[in-house]
Amino acid sequence: MRGRPLKFFFAFILVAVVLSPPAQTGRAQTSEPDEDQRKRLPLRPLYSMPEAFRPEDKPEDADFQPYTDRWRITPPEYEVNVRSSRWDPYNQNILKGDLPILGNDIFLNLSASIDTLVEFRQVPTPCGVSAARPFCEEFFGKPEQLLVNNNVALSADLFKGLTAFKPFDWRFKTTFIGNVNYLRVRENAIVNPDVRRGTTRTDGAAAVQELFAEYKIADLSPNFDFLSIRAGIQPFNSDFRGFIFTDSNLGVRLFGNFESNRSQFNLAYFDRLEKDTNSGLNRFKTRAGGQSVLVANYYRQDFPVLGLTEQVSVQRVAESKSFHFDNNDFLARPDPVGDFNRHSSKAIYFGWTGSGKIDRVNVEHAFYFVKGHDSHNPIAGRDVDIRAYMAALELSYDRDWLRPKVSYFFASGDGNPRDRTARGFDSIFDNPNFVGGGFSFWNRLAVKLTGTGVNLVNRGSLLPDLRSSKEEGQPNFINPGIHIVNFGVDVEVTPTVKLLLNANYLEFVKLETLQLLLFQSKIRKQIGWDLNAGIRYRPFNNNNVIAFFGFATFLPGKGFKDIFESSKPLHIGFTNLTLTF
């Protein structure tokens, strides 16, 4: 009896072992998974299998769906998804580079834009002998002018690569611009030296502003560092704020980066095309006599502190002798002032600039020194050596939706225009975004110097360089120089509206050049106050529709009054609308 329970116990254990399922062994399990498990497992890509083991027929089940490429995966039919259209620039569009047109990595981006400017301005304007009105006894006449300028641009960009961070393998781009402009003034001999042309001018131009090919020579690291070359008509800016050379012109550029994009470099050469006088666009011919520009620069990110990018550069400009009238029949080269003869010049700029943040303070700085030689400066009446410099600094601080800022700009002036050294700073072809940029009265307008054929300051420049024209004239390093002190604030009023307010005080550095040209012994340094405001409006929070509104008032100082014999305030107001597809 005592052995019977023990026999029953061993019999129960034996039956349980025989009837139990096989033990689970985790990752060592070799049995095939059931249907539910198989659906949860990731599918191995077929291309990873050896050629001999590839199945002839693809599996026919719900887990395998062939796609042409990753760009054409059809999204679910949710209400948030918008069906694409070739006329819709906002959503996925094969014509906007969102989808490849060939294979998996060749894209085409077509764009079109209309840019319309309407500008009312007041500029000191001489009243000549053949006046437009009777009873114009005074030297200066009516200052009012109206400018309407319209550009229509068509662009095609074909490239191989990815649309994100990977550099292009190759690229072709072209941009064609058609221009129509209209100018109305109140005095004769402004639109043309022939007074019979009257006080209005309507003109047009067609230009190729971009036409280049780009090719990636080599990948320099697994982190998408690269070396590329670009040849043709191409845009280029030699520094952060456009102080020295900013243009879209004919050239060759070698560029790239290394150290995971912490270092970038450019080596560029330009043989500049002639510019159209009234539109500023490229003409279909090289500059008469020739002007070549060579630029080498190097950028370093997070140096010497995190958030700050520093740049060093060397830029060389060589101008040959030439004789050139602009489209309005005014003499552009050589500058029609002093002892003007055809002359050549060479200058080398050594620059150090920076842009970024130090802690929470935004910092922009620049310093340039230029040296060279001019074979016959018209103001000096002789050959001169060039020695001049420029400095700029902007500090700003972001606090919520406000950015208050303070800026200073300095360009050296020449205190002895008759000696053999030219000490007034001049650029190659500048377009500075500084101390108010295009909203500034001083930066936006060309102010003609009384009784000469040169401008005190040119449109799109801060420098009182006494050139006939920034686009078609020659650099002139005998000039008065300038101090500019700026106080401003940028206000993000709403996500679509930005307000920019600036107050600039301007003063000449040296007066001897102006006194020599104007035969005036008494000219004071104070140029005046430039008060300007601008609004940028983007109704859709993108760049497809952008409207700019600007207004500036110039309060003449004692020096400006000495030159132009008036202390009346001058005004400018403009609106600029850009529509882009």
Residue ranges and their predicted role:
Residues F9-P21:
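Bacterial N-terminal signal peptides
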Residues A23-F168, T175, D400, P404, ...:
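N-terminal periplasmic/intermembrane-space "pro-region" immediately following the signal or transit peptide
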Residues L41-L43, P55, E60, N91, ...:
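Outer-membrane beta-barrel channel domains
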Residues N81-L110, R121-T125, F159-F172, I217-L227, ...:
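Short loop/turn motifs that connect adjacent beta-strands in outer-membrane beta-barrel proteins
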Residues N93-L95, A132-P143, N192-R197, Q234-F236, ...:
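Extracytoplasmic loops and strand-loop junctions of Gram-negative outer membrane beta-barrel proteins
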Residues N223-F226, Q234-A422, H483-V485, E492-V493, ...:
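Signature for the C-terminal beta-barrel architecture of outer-membrane proteins
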Residues A411, G415-Q526:
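C-terminal structural cap/anchor segments
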Residues N431, P539-F581:
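Predominantly the C-terminal beta-signal and adjacent terminal strand-loop region
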